[in-house]
Amino acid sequence: MVKMNKKDLALFCYPWDVIDEGYDAIIDAVKRSGLNSIYITVNYHSGMFFLPHSTKRKIYFPEPGALYFNPSDWHKKHSFQSPISNLTKNWNLFWEKLSSKCKQNNIKLCAWI
């Protein structure tokens, strides 16, 4: 488990922010703000989010309890299954690209649970 410490100055964000604004815009926001980490949620409850900064949508309702990653086979074997978000068809590629961009810019990437 990654613990926040005095050296972590993080942007907490949602996958829909990265998808809507783009990887480079998120990385740029972290750097311009003097931050060194991104904490991004991997699972979230329902709600209504106002997104005045977004050019794609002004309000977003996430899928209740959705996962923002492809779970292991263990997940498929149980009766209680959180839905996998349909924001993207390829969560593995989403995480690979975000991880790569963070590494290139010396930004720590952490899961916000």
Residue ranges with predicted function:
Residues 48-92:
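Aromatic- and acidic-residue-enriched carbohydrate-binding clefts of CAZyme catalytic domains
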Residues 2-3, 30-31, 95-110:
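Surface-exposed amphipathic alpha-helices with a cationic face
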Residues 9-13, 38-40, 109-111:
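Hydrophobic faces of well-ordered beta-strands that scaffold small-molecule active sites
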Residues 24-48:
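Catalytic domains of carbohydrate-active enzymes, especially glycoside hydrolases
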Residues 2-21:
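Boundary/entry segment of secreted carbohydrate-active catalytic domains
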Residues 15-17, 44-46, 113:
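Active-site-proximal loop/turn and secondary-structure-junction residues that shape catalytic pockets
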Residues 16-17, 88-89, 102:
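Residue-level marker of alpha-helix boundaries and capping positions
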Residues 21-27, 93-98:
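Short alpha-helical segments and helix-capping/turn motifs at coil-helix boundaries
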